[in-house]
Amino acid sequence: MANNVTDSSFKKEVLESDLPVLVDFWAEWCGPCKMLTPIIDEISKELKGKVKVLKMNIDENPNIPSEYGIRSIPTIMLFKNGEQKDTKIGLQQKNSLLDWINKSI
């Protein structure tokens, strides 16, 4: 299961991580976000030790999503070595996400 990240823990958990980090930006009211949750949780289990998978509620943590220009959710961002590497917007299929992650890291 993916852990939560907040505005205050983002720097330590994402930018200073030794592992690549996948961040799922979501909100409670977002239907596609809820559909993506089990996919993100499966990816978190499958890539454990290879990629850190985190979730950020944009309503509870508005600063980081604003800083990264997030305008639609779900938005999935991949970070490596403290830098944003790539972004996917909208509901994604598990296999396409895994391919994207593996190509990006």
UniProtKB/Swiss-Prot annotation:
Disulfide pattern: C30-C33
Could you tell me which Pfam families the record lists for this protein? Thioredoxin
Classification via SUPFAM superfamilies: Thioredoxin-like
Q: Which UniProt keywords apply?
A: Disulfide bond, Electron transport, Redox-active center, Transport
Q: Which domain of life is it from?
A: Bacteria
Domain Thioredoxin intervals: 1-105
In terms of Gene3D superfamilies, this protein maps to: Glutaredoxin
Q: Which Gene Ontology terms of cellular component type are present?
A: cytoplasm
> Per its record, what are the GO molecular function terms?
protein-disulfide reductase activity
Give the protein's biological function: Component of the thioredoxin-thioredoxin reductase system. Participates in various redox reactions through the reversible oxidation of its active center dithiol to a disulfide and catalyzes dithiol-disulfide exchange reactions.
Give the family per the record.
Belongs to the thioredoxin family.
Name of protein? Thioredoxin
Which species is the source of this protein?
Rickettsia felis (strain ATCC VR-1525 / URRWXCal2) (Rickettsia azadi)
Query: Taxonomic classification, please?
Result: Bacteria, Pseudomonadati, Pseudomonadota, Alphaproteobacteria, Rickettsiales
Gene name as annotated: trxA
